[in-house]
Amino acid sequence: MSKASIKLAFSDKYDHEHSLHYLEKHQDGMARKLSDYRDQQLARRALALAGGPNLVLDLPCGAGRFWSTLAEQPNRIILAADNSADMLATAMAAQPKHITEHVRTLQTSAFDINLPDNSVDSIFCMRLLHHIEKPEHRLALLKEFHRTTRDSVIISLWVDGNYKAWRRKALEKKRARRGRAHENSNRFVINRTTVEQEFIEAGFNIQTHLDFLASYSMWRVYVLRKNN
């Protein structure tokens, strides 16, 4: 299986309209604003733990939700990459100039990154891995990240072993009994031991992890270091 042949089911949906919706949804209501605040906290801490990398590949960058946090380090260059040209255009138009002056854009697939080996200090990958169900696809992604980064990867995903994961599993069983198993079928909870073994197999050491809300939330951020 070639890297270029891997394509996620939702990857073509982000036209201009969907990109605008994606930009707006994380500021829609108090709950999402608080969630975004916590996401930014975790991102800031993970970047510090990774040593404050200067050249960061934000992939997928989406609508630039994390750019203000990434740009807090004045000498940092943000290489913002996404599979969707519309998403990149939306992000550049929406974010203020003092943020975008730190940003260079790149349209590329996360599975086949159009960059040389060891070309960035860190890869910052938020809210992608929980969309990837197949272990072989996750491993292909992680190996491509290992090829491209010189040092670290910051990556978020849904893990098991918490209340939200238990609740989601119960809901999925209920949907299956009602013949509605296909609903929300593009997001997946990953076993912690399984994904940590995949990190190691791809050539990374696990420096640490940060939980959105320990024992309750599925969201976890890992800081990985390249094993040279």
PLM features: what roles do these ranges have?
Residues L57, A63-F111:
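Class I SAM-dependent methyltransferase SAM/SAH-binding core
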Residues M1-A50:
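Conserved class I S-adenosyl-L-methionine
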Residues V159-E201, T208-L210:
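C-terminal alpha-helical "lid/dimerization" subdomain adjacent to the S-adenosyl-L-methionine
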Residues R150-W158:
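Conserved beta-strand signature within the Rossmann-like core of class I S-adenosyl-L-methionine
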Residues F124:
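A conserved beta-strand element that flanks and buttresses the S-adenosyl-L-methionine
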Residues L139-D151:
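A short glycine-rich, Lys/Arg-flanked "PGG" loop and its adjoining helix->strand segment in the class I
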Residues R127-H131:
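Short catalytic micro-motifs in class I SAM-dependent methyltransferases
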Residues D112-D117:
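Short conserved loop adjoining the S-adenosyl-L-methionine
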